[in-house]
Curated annotation (Swiss-Prot):
Function field: Aldo-keto reductase that significantly contributes to cellular methylglyoxal detoxification by catalyzing the NADPH-dependent conversion of methylglyoxal to acetol.
Localization, UniProt: Cytoplasm
Pfam families (UniProt xref): Aldo_ket_red
Major subcellular site: cytoplasm
Gene3D superfamilies found in the cross-reference section: NADP-dependent oxidoreductase domain
InterPro entries: AKR, Aldo/ket_reductase_CS, NADP_OxRdtase_dom, NADP_OxRdtase_dom_sf
Assembly description: Monomer.
Protein's recorded name: Putative methylglyoxal reductase DkgA
Length: 275
């Protein structure tokens, strides 16, 4: 079996291409989920202030036998904290029981309140101080990203966006790539695979490779060069989602999955919502 792949970010730091998402997991659930994930081989954990489970993540990491330098921990600056990124980060670090973050992401641009450029400047300062190794954003459209770059000269290393076979965001993914911004997929299985796992091409590929539909979709993300963070608290599914290193999809198969794109957004529109 091939080793899990690592992505090099434009700031020179590296991160695992596949991680564990913990959205909607309780503090108790997340402890067991991370224990299982680390046992299986995950080294990247993606949480957020808004998930209200940073304390559980911190307890799980404290109890882990994996060295801190082997882990890649991400959390996110919530909308209400865009004018106080330093305080918000310090609160997150305390809950996570960490001295630094590997990746700090701004959760939404929230253009209606228009604080995201100032928040980004604050995050740049936190990176310079060494409190965070890398900084990025979530749910930013091209015009939001361009404004960050124009006004600060510092591009995000990551843009984490809703991305799955029904919502492939090819234009944004390509723009990110042109600007050396790594695209990361949230809701990569389209919220449990509804409308995806029953697609003929997904079922046929699952049969061909002896894999589950979820594994086919995760492999599609990986083979498209995306960082992917499927969420689960179910031990068997956590293991299943990581067992994707012994096969690859070919160009034609990727092309067939590309045809599933409907522009079907399951989450909020970044221009209309604050999450």
């Amino acid at each position: 079996m091939a080793n899990p792949t690592i992505i090099r970010l434009q700031d020179g730091n590296v991160m695992p291409q596949l991680g564990l998402g913990v959205w909607k997991a309780s503090n108790e659930e997340v402890i067991a989920a991370i224990h299982k994930a680390l046992e299986v081989g995950y080294r990247s954990i993606d949480t957020a202030t808004a998930y209200q489970n940073e304390e559980g993540v911190g307890k799980a990491l404290k109890a882990a036998s994996v060295a801190r330098e082997e882990l890649f921990i991400t959390t996110k600056l919530w909308n209400d904290d865009q004018k106080r990124p330093r305080e918000a980060l310090q609160e997150s670090l305390k809950k996570l029981q960490l001295d630094y973050l590997d990746l700090y992401l701004m959760h939404w641009p929230v253009p209606a309140i228009d604080h995201y450029v100032d928040a980004w400047k604050g995050m740049i300062a936190l990176q310079k101080e060494g409190l965070v190794k890398s900084i990025g954003v979530c749910n930013f459209q091209i015009h939001h990203l361009q404004r960050l770059i124009d006004e600060t000269g510092v591009p995000p290393v990551i843009n984490q966006i809703e991305l799955h076979p029904l919502m492939q965001q090819r234009q944004l993914h390509a723009w990110n790539a042109t600007h050396k911004i790594q695209t990361e997929s949230w809701s990569p299985l389209a919220q449990g695979g509804e409308g995806v796992f029953d697609q003929k091409v997904i079922r046929e590929l699952a049969d061909k490779y002896g894999k589950t539909p979820a594994q086919i979709v995760i492999r599609w993300h990986l083979d498209c060069g995306l960082v992917v963070i499927p969420k689960s608290v179910t031990p068997s599914r956590i293991a299943e989602n990581f067992a994707v290193w012994d096969f690859r999809l070919d160009k034609d198969e990727l092309g067939e999955i590309a045809k599933l794109d409907q522009g079907k957004r399951l989450g909020p529109d970044p221009d209309q919502s604050g999450g």
